[in-house]
């Protein structure tokens, strides 16, 4: 079972494409603050130190 919500995985896919919070917020019609919160929550729940590490682990686990 994944620790990430569907929305978090959706955001993670955008992060893996190299998009920043503002671009993701624009694409998903959300606020930059919301994207930032999701990103922080993903890092916290996954115990990853960086977004790059989070993307790497998600790729290995076939989440994205």
Tell me what each language-model feature is.
Residues 20-53:
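Recognition helix of helix-turn-helix DNA-binding domains
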Residues 12-17, 28, 57:
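Short alpha-helical segment immediately N-terminal to, or the first helix within
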Residues 14, 46-47, 63:
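Enrichment for repetitive, rod-forming helical segments
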Residues 1-14:
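Regulatory hinge/linker segments at domain boundaries
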Residues 57-64:
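Intrinsically disordered, low-complexity basic tails/linkers immediately adjacent to helix-turn-helix/homeobox/MYB/SANT
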């Amino acid at each position: 079972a994944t620790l990430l919500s569907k929305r978090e995985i959706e955001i993670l896919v955008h992060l893996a494409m190299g998009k920043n919070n503002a671009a993701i917020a624009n694409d998903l019609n959300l606020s930059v603050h919301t994207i930032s919160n999701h990103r922080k929550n993903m890092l916290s729940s996954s115990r990853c130190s960086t977004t790059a590490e989070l993307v790497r682990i998600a790729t290995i686990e076939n989440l994205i």
